[in-house]
């Protein structure tokens, strides 16, 4: 055997090992409005999605659960969610309700006059779960409400808007407690919030720590395409993981697969073996950390394109 062939075989073995390590961590995927509604409308679309995701060892879907294009299936046709969640559960998969929408401009929900909309959005999920059969209930909630998307986000307004996010989150968590339900609720959170110290309810600490205190878990938008070194997945998650370890909370590492600038934000353009190697390094670093909740991929359509299994055209 030539050295080149031997080296190639060794590389393949190492990548396979990295992939097998990464497979041990839970994997989830964000499924946004159009793809979620397509799965809810057509069971065959959902079944095809389950097949692909299970082949890629993805065990949890963050399924959109609010209004889209004039419909709100959670309220108007809850049986569609019943059927979807039952089918996922029958395959051993979990389903979290995904809340927040670019179409609905939900970044505005951090504003005091609109925070009640965020609570109402969650309350609809809680009401659905209370009425649904056990096998058709959501397993958790993830909300993606990003105040930095507001036009008014700037240095002078940032503290006020972040306090609004915390007030909104506190109100949402109170609604969950009042419901008597125990499903975990947590936000998508940028990794850079750990660099912003904020006074809130008598305590000054990084915004990330306030959020971890408030919620059951965080999905950390840790959008980098290498595991180690400066400006990496591990470096940007370090403070959140350390704090969550101390507080008994969970951090799910969010990774990006869609095109973006700069290129370091996403695995787009890399091959799947390279991604698995980086994911394996993250899990190797965190496998003994109680805070590590696995990975969540952004997003369903982008991830499917990345692995060479694009969403079929309608």
Feature names for model-found ranges:
Residues 65, 125-160, 296:
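Active-site groove signature of glycoside hydrolases
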Residues 96-102, 165-203, 249-258:
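Aromatic-lined carbohydrate-recognition surfaces of secreted/lumenal glycan-active proteins
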Residues 112-141, 207-211:
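An active-site-proximal structural segment forming one wall of the substrate-binding cleft
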Residues 41-49, 78-83, 124-129, 191-210, ...:
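Alpha-helical scaffolding within the catalytic cores
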Residues 223-226, 247-314:
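Substrate-binding cleft of secreted/luminal carbohydrate-active enzymes
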Residues 139, 145-149, 203-232:
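Aromatic- and acid-rich polysaccharide-binding/catalytic face
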Residues 22-53, 298:
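Boundary/entry segment of secreted carbohydrate-active catalytic domains
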Residues 170, 181, 185, 220-263:
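Glycoside hydrolase catalytic-domain groove-lining segments
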């Amino acid at each position: 055997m030539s050295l080149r062939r031997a080296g190639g075989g060794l590389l393949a073995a190492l990548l396979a090992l990295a992939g097998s390590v990464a497979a041990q961590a839970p994997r989830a995927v964000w499924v946004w409005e159009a793809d979620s509604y397509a799965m809810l409308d057509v069971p065959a679309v959902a079944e095809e999605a389950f097949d692909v995701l299970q082949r890629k060892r993805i065990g949890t879907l963050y399924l959109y659960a609010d209004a889209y294009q004039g419909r709100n299936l959670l309220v108007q046709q809850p049986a569609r969610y019943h059927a979807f969640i039952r089918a996922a559960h029958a395959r051993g998969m979990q389903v979290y309700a995904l809340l927040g929408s670019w179409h609905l401009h939900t970044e505005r929900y951090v504003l005091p006059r609109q925070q009640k909309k965020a609570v109402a959005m969650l309350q609809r999920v809680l009401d659905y779960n209370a009425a649904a059969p056990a096998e058709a209930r959501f397993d958790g909630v993830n909300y993606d409400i990003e105040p930095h998307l507001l036009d008014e986000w700037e240095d002078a307004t940032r503290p006020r808007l972040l306090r609004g996010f915390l007030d909104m989150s506190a109100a949402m968590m109170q609604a969950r407690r009042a419901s008597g339900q125990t499903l975990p609720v947590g936000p998508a959170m940028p990794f850079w919030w750990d660099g912003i110290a904020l006074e809130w309810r008598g305590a000054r600490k990084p915004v990330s720590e306030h959020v971890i205190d408030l919620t059951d878990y965080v999905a950390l938008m840790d959008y980098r395409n290498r595991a180690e070194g400066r400006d990496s997945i591990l470096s940007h998650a370090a403070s959140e993981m350390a704090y969550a370890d101390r507080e008994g909370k969970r951090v799910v590492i969010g990774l990006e697969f869609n095109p973006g600038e700069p290129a370091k934000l996403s695995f787009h353009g890399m091959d799947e073996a390279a991604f698995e190697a980086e994911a394996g390094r993250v899990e190797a670093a965190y496998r003994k950390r109680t805070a590590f909740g696995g990975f969540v991929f952004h997003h369903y359509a982008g991830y499917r394109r990345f692995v060479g299994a694009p969403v079929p055209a309608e």
